[in-house]
Amino acid sequence: MSAQLDKEYPTFRHLFEVPTLKSLNISSDTNESIYLCGNSLGLMPKSTRKAINDELDTWAQQGVEGHFSHPERTPWVDIDLPLLPLMAPIVGAKESEVAVMGSLTSNLNAMLMSFYKPKGKRTKILFEKHAFPSDYYAFLNIVQLFGYDESHLIQVAVQDGATYLRTEDIIFEIENNAEELALVCFPGIQYYTGQFFDIKSITKAAQDHGICVGWDLAHAVGNVPLNLHDWNVDFAVWCSYKYLNSGPGAMAGIFVHQRHTENNSKTSYNPRLAGWWGNNAQERFQMKEEFNPINSALSYRQSNPSVIDTVAVKASLKVFQEANGIQFLREKSIKMTQFLQDLLTQSQYYINQNEKPTKLGFQILTPLDPNQRGCQLSLLFHPHYDEKSKNIMEQVNKYLHNRGIVCDERRPDVIRVAPTPLYNTFAEIEYAVKSLNEALNQIEN
C-alpha cells in the first residue's frame, strides 16, 4: 500500500540533504536515514549551501559596498524584503503584516512589550498549562516587569483523563476570567502533544471581550495552513528551523495585523522595543533623534538582519514555492499522518487514549482527528521501566536510531514522530512502525 501512496503523492526529497547511516555514525552504510524529526529541526535544502556561499563571496569581494551595491542580488540593506512575498502566504497574511527578524523568544518578548497593556483589573495573561518553558519565562518576566507576580498568570490545564485541551475549555476560561485578562497567548500547535488549536475560534472568543490575542506558531508554520489576517490575530511569532527548514537557530518571523501599523506616524504608534531598522527607510541613515516607524510589521525590526541567516530562510521558503505551497503539502500531510495512525492503532502494543495502561505498549497523545493536529503524533510509552529498571521509551528510541530512524524523544516517556510531506515517504512510515513493533517485541521477550 505504501508504494501506491508514494506514486500518488510526490515527494520533494531530491531538494534536501538527507543524513546517511554513515554520517549519523550508525554504520558504514551510505543509505539515507529515515528522518522523522522535522518538528525539531528540518533538513537542509540543497540550495542553502550555494545561497550562503554566494554571500560569503560578496563579502570577500565587495566588503561594505555589498550593503548598497550588490553585483548579482539584493543589496544587503534590503536583504530581507524579498522574503515577505514568500513568507506571507505561508501564514495567511498580507506582505505588510510579516517581518523576518530575530529569534522566537526574543520576538515574543518584543511583542509582549508592545501588546501586553495591563490596565485597572485587566492585568493577567491566559495561556496553557505545560507551555513550552521559554514562553512561560517570557510571560512571567513581562508581568514582573510591570510589578506583578506569577498569580497574574492563568494556565488552562487538560481535564483529568484527557491527553489534550478542548477548545470549549479554553473559551470557558477566557469568558470566566475576561474582566481580569490583558492578553491571551497560546501555541498554534502544542509542541508536546501535537494538538492544532482552533486559532480562529479562540481569537474571536477573546477579542469579543476586548482582549488582545497572540500566538506562538513555532510548530504550526510550514506544517498547517494559516489565515492570520482573516482570523484577525493581533500578533504572532514563530521560528523557521523546524518545518521551514532554515537551519539551526535560524532567523525567525513575526506577524502584526495591519490595523496596528497602517496608521503609524512620528507622533502615533504602538510602543515597542524600537531600533533603527524599524525606522522609515528614507530617513534611516540621516541619524535623526526621531523615530518614524514604517507603516508595516517591518517597524518592529530593531537591527539590520544577518545576511547569512536571511538567505538561508529565503532558500527554504523557495522550496515551499516550488512544492506548490502549504495547501498542497497539507493534503499529503493529512494522508501521511493518517497512514501512520492507522498502522500504529493496528499494533498489538497500541493502547487506546481512554484506556488505563496495564501492559507494555504506547498511547497516542495527539488528537486522532486530522483537523486537530499537524503532521506530528506523540507516543507515550508504558510502563516507565521494564523488569530490568530500564526506561522503555529510551530503549525503543535507541532501537529505532540503530536502524536509521531519527525521531525526537521527550523524557521521560514520549517519542514524537513527524512525517514531513516535503521529504518523507509512506514507505518510510511503514518501515518505522514495523521497527517500533520489533523494538517492543524485543523488550517484551
UniProtKB/Swiss-Prot annotation:
One of its GO terms (cellular component) is cytoplasm. Pathway: Amino-acid degradation; L-kynurenine degradation; L-alanine and anthranilate from L-kynurenine: step 1/1; Cofactor biosynthesis; NAD(+) biosynthesis; quinolinate from L-kynurenine: step 2/3. GO terms for biological process: 'de novo' NAD biosynthetic process from L-tryptophan; anthranilate metabolic process; L-kynurenine catabolic process; L-tryptophan catabolic process to kynurenine; quinolinate biosynthetic process. It is found in: Cytoplasm. The keyword Protein biosynthesis does not apply. The keyword Cytoplasm applies. One of its GO terms (molecular function) is kynureninase activity. Pyridoxal 5'-phosphate binds at L104, T105, F132, P133, S134, D135, D216, H219, Y241, W276, N304. The modification N6-(pyridoxal phosphate)lysine is found at K242. Its EC number is 3.7.1.3. Its main location: cytoplasm. Its cofactor is pyridoxal 5'-phosphate. Keywords: Cytoplasm, Hydrolase, Pyridine nucleotide biosynthesis, Pyridoxal phosphate. It catalyses: L-kynurenine + H2O = anthranilate + L-alanine + H(+); 3-hydroxy-L-kynurenine + H2O = 3-hydroxyanthranilate + L-alanine + H(+). It is an enzyme of class 3 (hydrolase). Belongs to the kynureninase family. PANTHER family: KYNURENINASE (PTHR14084:SF0). Catalyzes the cleavage of L-kynurenine (L-Kyn) and L-3-hydroxykynurenine (L-3OHKyn) into anthranilic acid (AA) and 3-hydroxyanthranilic acid (3-OHAA), respectively. Homodimer. This is Kynureninase. The lineage of its organism: Eukaryota, Fungi, Dikarya, Ascomycota, Saccharomycotina.
